[in-house]
Amino acid sequence: DSKVIYREYIQNACDQIDLAIKLGILSSDEGYVDIYIDSKKRYISVKDNATGVRAADFIEDVGDIANSNKEIGKNKGFRGIGRLCGLAYCKTLKFTTSYLGECIKSIMTCNAEKMRAMLVENKKYTLDEIWDAIVTYSTESEEKNEHYFEVEMFGINKENTDLLNDKKVRDYLSFVVPVPYKNTFVLRNQVYSYAKSIDYSIDEYCVRVNGSQIFKEYTTKLKEQSGASL
């Protein structure tokens, strides 16, 4: 399912939101992940307001595909090369980030279309040769108080049009990412109370698709195996 790229990028963002709260950059309820989908332009953006990446660390942290500071069992997102999963679904993959207090934003642009062309050529390329051929780095000025990380995918492949289906993406995310329960879910308070009684923290984040927040779509309707309501 190509929609797994949304889960990957959201989980990475949630890890950084946790860190931003720990560092005092965000309060516990300020973090968010905004997804913007433009089906006509075949464009997707996933942006958070977490820590961002320092300019001095950008190439090592984002550009080194073998490098990762993820901790197994602690962090939600995949490690290392996982951030590049979008390469399979678009013509261009772009990362833009800025760290609080720095007047600069760092940009890494990956030519996914060129990568695929090189992979089908008769000539055999090393990973480093392909990487050097498809990646460019640049910087631009930014407001000092800005802090974010944004993933952009330009030219979504025709085979992956489901990534541009707003409703399908919302439905998928409501079941696979750590978002709050709907207020209409009558067992909501019971779930929170029980979690509190066993000292268990339920991770919940504000995730929005085209401005509309995503919630868990749980209901209290019980059905038999036949499908009949109880």
Which residues fall in each region the model found?
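Conserved ATP-binding N-box helix of the HATPase_c
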Residues: D1-I35, G82-A88
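A broadly tuned "polar low-complexity/structure-edge" signature
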Residues: N12-Q16, L87, T97, L173-T184
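Interdomain "switch/hinge" adjacent to the Bergerat
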Residues: I21-G77, G101-L230
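Glycine-rich phosphate-binding loop
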Residues: E71-C90
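Glycine-rich ATP-binding loops of the HATPase_c
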Residues: T92-T96
